[in-house]
Amino acid sequence: MKLTSHDIIRKPIITEKSMASMAEKRYTFIVHVDANKSQIKRAVEEVFNVKVESVNTINGLGKTKRMGVHVGKRSDYKKAIVTLTEESNGIEFFEGMQ
């Protein structure tokens, strides 16, 4: 399956820790599980029109949940922490949240 840039970036993560790291031009996203670092870098540069310096990824396993005797599982996820270059402006989407 060919992933487009909008398929790769699922949603931003808005937490106290991620908001504090925005001062250092680091932004956190939930991304597609099959996306690699180079695809994530290309997608962020294309969608937000910025230059990316580095991408760090974290794979999260979904928890097993029970409802009585029924057992289910939450979806696995991948988190990407994207660092922008010094000359790059911040991402406008996040500007009002600081």
Swiss-Prot record:
Xref: PROSITE patterns: RIBOSOMAL_L23 (PS00050)
GO molecular function: rRNA binding; structural constituent of ribosome
Cleaved signal peptide residues: none
Chain ranges passing through the membrane: none
Complexes and interactors: Part of the 50S ribosomal subunit. Contacts protein L29, and trigger factor when it is bound to the ribosome.
The protein's name: Large ribosomal subunit protein uL23
Summary of the function given for this chain in its UniProt record: One of the early assembly proteins it binds 23S rRNA. One of the proteins that surrounds the polypeptide exit tunnel on the outside of the ribosome. Forms the main docking site for trigger factor binding to the ribosome.
Keywords: Ribonucleoprotein, Ribosomal protein, RNA-binding, rRNA-binding
UniProt xrefs under Pfam families: Ribosomal_L23
Entry-linked SUPFAM superfamilies: Ribosomal proteins S24e, L23 and L15e
Organism: Clostridium beijerinckii (strain ATCC 51743 / NCIMB 8052) (Clostridium acetobutylicum)
GO CC list: ribonucleoprotein complex; ribosome
Family in the record: Belongs to the universal ribosomal protein uL23 family.
GO BP terms in the entry: translation
